Amino acid sequence: GCSQFEPRDKRFYYRALWNFSLREDLAELDSEFNGVDFGHSNLYENLLLTGGQDVPAIEERARKQTIAFIATKPRLNPNEEAIAPTYMKLAWRAQNTFDEAHALHRATYDIAVSDEPEKDRAIRNVLAYYKDSAYAITSKRLDHHRLDQFPYSKAFRTRFPLFNATIWSYHYLQVAVYDPLQAARDLAAKTQAVRPILATYRRYLEQPPVQWTFMPLTAELSPQFAARYPELANIFDNLHMLHDNISDILTSERLPTWEAKRAEIYRVLNSYYLASADATNPMIVQGQEHHH
């Protein structure tokens, strides 16, 4: 186990009149995101407890638990600490990095759905609040291909293709809704606009897109959002790449002990993902556009 005690310096979410607009006004989308939160935590806990070696435990049991939870259409986001107590003890700082980025995702959906008249200003404010955190992921464009070339990279998608494609389906949903939400003028139109995406997402849950070779990217699925808010697009893509890295670390036998896994999670987080590393981060793409 891990004996080191980590201070839990959690921040409260950014307070605004638009808080919880998604939950109140577009509950069918909100409940899907609550299911996504469960899926990530349930995966990490099961990977850790099975040593990343037990294919049926992940591909069948843990994946089906997640699909069943999503099917209940949860009204509130789950307590991830209750779902993944072992993982939270192992790498709390990494989990808090996820939590703050997920709160940023939620805030941007709330703003998009709300009747807030100055949406750009609201997004600028919530982004500034996010960047003020010690757990902020860099808003610079990272070289995802280099970040996918560690010795243990691709271990998760190779061993667990179904759950990997399920995770990528979550990431599809998270970024595909931005352009339709922003283009639709009123709540009725927004509700209609996300329905085809929800239908595609639910189809992916039933038949995971195992043919995909890389995670979905914001600029591919919501190009107008990415052009308007490039820093947000980078943060969300980097968040999703960090998810892939941690899944690989938890799966790979190259890092046989929990201590080794924890050390590598924190090495990668501190060196390549946190905005606090921007001055020295070798994974930042300099200047040019970066496409997959």
Model-derived features: positions:
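Polar/charged low-complexity regulatory segments
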Residues: 2-292
